[in-house]
Amino acid sequence: SSLAFVSNPDIPNIPTQLGATHAGNPGANSAAGTMQHLAFKVKDHTELMAMRDRLRSKGVPVLGPLDHGMCVSMYFAGLENLSLELSYSAEPINNELWIDPEVVELAGISAEELAGYKNPNTFSDSHGSIGQPAINNSTGPHMTNYPPGVYEKSMQIPDEIALNMVESKPPVSP
């Protein structure tokens, strides 16, 4: 898989507020809908240490490794106040040991919901045949901050047309 950090010329003009727009560290808060921190999985302790050395060799301070019991992690800052984590687990996380009943109660999660989280329904790949849900009746999260009507129109574009709507050639030719 890939991860892209996208920027545009207007982003530097948007104020950053630690504790609201960004956490700034892996233990601090940020507003709902923002990214508190992003964790990347590495294979094992050897790979974790290799990544730590690689980061430190580039002048990036790294906290850890820290053994959390369910995983071993290390934390560092990314560009633009992103808080990043690298971690591995030697064994699958035992949800009977690591799901705190007090937190479940405080979050208002019912026994039925919890069972669904612990054992989600299996998903059968439909090989791209599932259509777009009706935007006005969809229960899933929605993208926002579009001019009025643009999101609704965009979500009505057939997939086969959307596939070729954007520039797909690299900026440099061989």
Predicted regions: what is each one?
Residues 68-72:
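Short acidic/glycine-enriched loop/turn segments that link adjacent beta-strands
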Residues 63-67:
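Short beta-strand-to-loop elements that line the ligand-binding cleft
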Residues 1-61, 77-174:
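Glyoxalase I/VOC metalloenzyme domain signal
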